UniProtKB/Swiss-Prot annotation:
This is PTS system sorbose-specific EIIB component. Dimer of dimers. GO terms for cellular component: cytoplasm. Its EC number is 2.7.1.206. It is found in: Cytoplasm. The gene is sorB. One of its GO terms (molecular function) is kinase activity. It holds the Pfam family PTSIIB_sorb. Its main location: cytoplasm.
């Protein structure tokens, strides 16, 4: 399986993803990897309906995403992975899914999180997950839109003296 793009965007499929990122990815399908979304039938249905024209969308559990990645039947597939958080990415990478670059595009503010950029808010567990991904060799590309300059999220955390 060839991963053409892996992106964290907690809105999952929305305007930027359907009009820009899906073209950047140039993949045959979008695979949304998240247990909570997989277990929410209404959300799963809505996300499939929001698919960009001509692109298949699958919403799968992390376990299924890892199994499909390792299945030789899908070795010629090109995929665009969408995640809601770095913890799910870390789980998959630890199970042998080879993600070279992770684009971080949107992580909404919630209680307990601090705003790093307009589109990305983090808590200490998120930062730790990004550090682990970095140690595992995953390039961390903080970009909301494709035309933004690429910035390593850990550099941004360090330069802004972002407190954990």
């Amino acid at each position: 399986m060839q991963i053409t793009l892996a992106r964290i965007d907690d809105r999952l499929i929305h305007g930027q993803v359907t009009t820009v990122w899906s073209k950047v990815a140039n993949a045959q399908r979008i695979i949304i990897c998240n247990d909570d979304v997989f277990n929410d039938e209404v959300r799963r249905t809505l996300l499939r309906q929001a698919a960009p024209p001509g692109m298949k969308v699958n919403v799968v559990s992390l376990e299924k995403a890892v199994a499909v990645y390792h299945n030789p039947q899908y070795q010629d597939e090109t995929v665009f992975y969408l995640f809601t958080n770095p913890h799910d990415v870390l789980t998959m990478v630890r199970q042998g899914v080879q993600i070279a670059t992770l684009n971080i595009g949107g992580m909404a503010w919630r209680p307990g999180k601090k705003q790093l950029t307009k589109a990305v808010s983090l808590d200490p567990q998120d930062i730790q997950a990004f550090r682990e991904l970095d140690k595992l060799g995953v390039k961390l590309d903080l970009r909301v839109v494709a035309s933004d300059p690429s910035v390593n999220i850990l550099d941004k955390i360090n330069e802004t003296a972002f407190c954990e």
